[in-house]
Amino acid sequence: MASISSSVATVSRTAPAQANMVAPFTGLKSNAAFPTTKKANDFSTLPSNGGRVQCMKVWPPLGLKKYETLSYLPPLTETQLAKEVDYLLRKKWVPCLEFELEHGFVYRENARSPGYYDGRYWTMWKLPMFGCTDSAQVMKELAECKKEYPQAWIRIIGFDNVRQVQCIMFIASRPDGY
């Protein structure tokens, strides 16, 4: 029986310790050379809202659901909705209407993960209104959608087709009782 043996040779090199070292940077000066001013803790000059603190309220968690942009406001009138649509048209955004029959608020059905995505899919009302130049056109479509689905949440979206992002979204109509 033949045996094979192998040996591994190791090579160790020694380099001078000073060859790879870099001298420390000495160009910075200590902070002691700079003049400093010590200010007293004077809180009288800080901005204050004074007595108005008791008037401020947070969003109540019961009874009022938060929907989209502007959802903290009372329902918008037709004139106010038209002004919002005029704004998104001035920004050259494409208006689009969507509606939801069951859940017009944030809930988790299709995704359970936290974060920006809220798990909702809304149904698009017709196609995005490419080439729309007048808020009256959008308001006419909103009226048609309300007539077809009176118990639906309807929202108006402003879509930037250059950047391909949704820039604004707000509830235009809610079912009775919401």
Swiss-Prot record:
Keyword NAD set for record: no
Cellular localisation: Plastid, Chloroplast
GO molecular function: ribulose-bisphosphate carboxylase activity
InterPro entries: RuBisCO_ssu, RuBisCO_ssu_dom, RuBisCO_ssu_N, RuBisCO_ssu_sf
GO biological process, one term: reductive pentose-phosphate cycle
One CC-aspect GO term: chloroplast
Claim: Chloroplast is one of the keywords in the record: yes
Residue pairs linked by disulfide bridges in the UniProt entry: none
Keywords per UniProt: Calvin cycle, Carbon dioxide fixation, Chloroplast, Photorespiration, Photosynthesis, Plastid, Transit peptide
Span of the transit peptide along the chain: 1-54
Pfam family, one: RbcS
Main location as per UniProt: plastid
HAMAP family: RuBisCO_S_bact (MF_00859)
Note from the entry: The basic functional RuBisCO is composed of a large chain homodimer in a 'head-to-tail' conformation. In form I RuBisCO this homodimer is arranged in a barrel-like tetramer with the small subunits forming a tetrameric 'cap' on each end of the 'barrel'.
Oligomer and partners: Heterohexadecamer of 8 large and 8 small subunits.
Family: Belongs to the RuBisCO small chain family.
Free-text function comment from the UniProt entry: RuBisCO catalyzes two reactions: the carboxylation of D-ribulose 1,5-bisphosphate, the primary event in carbon dioxide fixation, as well as the oxidative fragmentation of the pentose substrate. Both reactions occur simultaneously and in competition at the same active site. Although the small subunit is not catalytic it is essential for maximal activity.
Name of the protein in its database record: Ribulose bisphosphate carboxylase small subunit, chloroplastic
